[in-house]
Regions:
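PAS-family sensory domains
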Residues: 1-3, 67, 116-127, 283
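Sensory-domain boundary/capping and coupling elements
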Residues: 8-23, 130-142, 148, 152-159
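PAS/PAS-like sensory domain cap-loop motif
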Residues: 47-59, 68-70
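Per-ARNT-Sim (PAS) sensory domains and their PAS-associated C-terminal
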Residues: 85-106, 117, 257-259
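Short loop/turn elements at sensory-signaling interfaces that couple input to output
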Residues: 108-120, 272-276
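Conserved long alpha-helical elements within nucleotide-processing catalytic cores of c-di-GMP signaling
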Residues: 137-141, 148-173, 180-210, 216-220, ...
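Catalytic-core segments of nucleotide cyclases and related cyclic-nucleotide turnover enzymes
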Residues: 191, 240-241, 255-256, 269-300
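Catalytic core regions of nucleotide second-messenger enzymes
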Residues: 216-218, 233, 247-264, 273, ...
Length: 301
């Protein structure tokens, strides 16, 4: 004979399990897809919402539609299915494409369904998280006022430039700038106007460098230009002439207030003057102070 109470309890547990499974499948945050031959044979509503498809329209489609381009689709297939074939899970954070063409970041987690020739994939939109990470990284490595690279990012760029220099037998120039005439402007017109002068100066520096060079603000009214792959020191002189001419252009602060600044500059070359970022910055800083003293003597005369 059957125990009716046990049978009822078993049915209740099964019903609860079905509800839990359905809740998981209907989860609005995690998209789920069953894929065979890279065609979606089943999906939950969340997957269509994540990728912007109308309800019921994603099933039966080739997954290629969800990738940035065909090359990305093929590369993912090679990498992911090679891992799945070993019986392991495959997980990656990657850029994918919504039906509108918008690019989003997706956390992709897949497993092979044994004996079915199918794979099961969980996908979650992590675009907001990625954007937040990028903002945090930007804040950590950029000057808040000018948005130029700060000392930390400059040091990293210098390390990369030194490695390139070693491979290509070229030089790296570190040019250290200190503005002349900034303090009187700051004292007379206030910090807001002083900040505007620094921002304009930063933009002018950035406009004068090549794409593989770096303009950085490392504090106060001090800036650094990192010039990479220098074959002839004359290239540095030519670049500095352009930069100094740009810095010395009048700055219109509005309300009839037009100011000018100039700069003292010191240059150090890798590997001639040092082989580390600390040594090169120190050498360029010392050369800058020598130049600043020379400028001061000229003005007093």
């Amino acid at each position: 004979m059957y125990d009716v109470s046990e049978l009822h309890a078993a049915r209740q547990q099964l019903h609860t399990l079905n509800l839990e499974q359905q809740a998981m499948l209907d989860n609005d945050m995690i998209g789920i897809a069953k894929v065979k031959d890279r065609v979606i044979v089943w999906r939950n509503p969340a997957l269509e919402r994540i990728f912007g498809y109308a309800p019921g329209t994603l099933q039966g489609r080739l997954t290629e539609e969800m990738y940035v381009d065909r090359e990305d689709f093929l590369a993912f297939g090679r990498d992911a299915y090679a891992v799945l074939a070993t019986g392991q899970h495959y997980r990656q954070q990657r850029r994918m494409r919504k039906v509108t063409g918008e690019i989003v970041w997706i956390d992709v987690n897949g497993v092979l369904l044994q004996g079915q020739g199918e794979s099961l994939w969980l996908m979650q939109d992590i675009t907001a998280m990625k954007q937040y990470q990028e903002q945090v990284e930007h804040i950590a490595f950029h000057d808040a006022l000018t948005q130029l690279p700060n000392r930390l990012l400059l040091a990293d760029r210098m390390t990369q430039a030194f490695a390139l220099s070693d491979r290509t037998q070229t030089q790296v120039a570190v040019c250290y700038f200190d503005l002349n005439g900034f303090k009187p402007i700051n004292d007379r017109y206030g910090h807001d106007m002083g900040d505007e002068v620094l921002k304009i100066t930063g933009r002018r520096l950035l406009e004068q460098v090549r794409g593989n060079d770096t303009a950085a603000r490392i504090g106060g009214d001090e800036f650094v230009l990192l010039l990479t792959a220098v074959k002839d020191p004359a290239e540095v002189d030519q670049a500095l002439c352009r930069v100094m001419a740009a810095i010395e252009q009048p700055i219109d602060l509005g309300g009839g207030r037009v100011v000018r600044v100039s700069a003292a500059v010191g240059t150090a070359l890798y590997p001639r003057d040092g082989t580390t970022s600390f040594e090169l910055l120190r050498a360029a800083d010392q050369a800058m102070y020598a130049d600043k003293g020379h400028v001061s003597v000229e003005r007093s005369l």
